[in-house]
């Protein structure tokens, strides 16, 4: 049981640390709290006066929670582009829980079942490697930082490590120049609001190189102007 307690607790701390570096930290932050809560529940279970529970319960729990996190995380990673942490870490939990359950049946399984279990376990590991590569190695997409930058403007958070300027400056994308155009436009408007003509012109010049203001959706600039109270 202590193995599972340490696993859930360690993953909770690790995910929380990663969440602080994300454009939308609350998504993976909530997942970290769920895992920490589970580790506390398992710890309380070890101190219960009466035992006799299912020793495989933590493995089932890891499989269910991890599998659910993978589904949710893949949507956030590939569809809405909001988070890249939940899916790979959920996959780790799912792999550990599932492989533990498969290994428990290994000795009593026939050859066909053993081959099937091995293929299934190998497939899970390969998929997990992809999730780690896509989420933790490739990392956050530029569009995610651009979206979070707009949110920070709406909150009035402009400066600092978690301000709108910092988020937009992390949103550069070598493949999608339209994202760069949106970010340069946003930064130009922010510096216009602050009467920083030098910085504003730097981003206007960069914006002109990739199509100018015409390359930016009017709805984007109008929304930013509204939040910045620019006429």
Predicted segments with their positions:
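Boundary/linker segments of alpha-helical solenoid repeat arrays
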Residues: 176-181, 209-222
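Tetratricopeptide repeat
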Residues: 162-165, 172, 201, 208
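Residue at a conserved register position within TPR or TPR-like alpha-solenoid repeats
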Residues: 152-155, 191
């Amino acid at each position: 049981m202590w193995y599972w307690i340490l696993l859930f607790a360690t993953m909770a701390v690790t995910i929380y640390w990663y969440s602080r570096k994300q454009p939308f930290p609350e998504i993976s932050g909530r997942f970290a709290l769920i895992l920490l809560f589970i580790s506390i529940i398992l710890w309380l279970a070890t101190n219960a006066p009466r035992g006799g529970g299912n020793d495989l319960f933590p493995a089932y729990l890891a499989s269910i929670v991890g599998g659910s996190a993978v589904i949710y995380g893949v949507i956030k990673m590939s569809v809405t582009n909001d988070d890249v942490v939940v899916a790979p870490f959920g996959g780790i939990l799912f792999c550990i829980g599932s492989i533990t359950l498969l290994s428990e049946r290994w000795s009593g399984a026939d050859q066909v079942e053993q081959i099937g279990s091995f293929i299934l376990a190998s497939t899970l590991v390969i998929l997990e490697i992809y999730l780690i590569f896509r989420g933790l190695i490739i990392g956050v997409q530029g569009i995610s930082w651009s979206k979070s930058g707009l949110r920070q403007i709406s909150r009035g958070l402009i400066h600092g490590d978690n301000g709108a300027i910092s988020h937009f400056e992390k949103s550069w994308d070598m493949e999608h120049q339209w994202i760069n155009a949106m970010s340069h436009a946003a930064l130009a408007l922010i510096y216009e609001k602050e009467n920083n003509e030098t910085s504003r012109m730097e981003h206007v010049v960069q914006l002109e190189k990739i199509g100018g203001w015409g390359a930016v959706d009017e709805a984007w600039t109008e929304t930013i102007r509204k939040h910045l109270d620019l006429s």
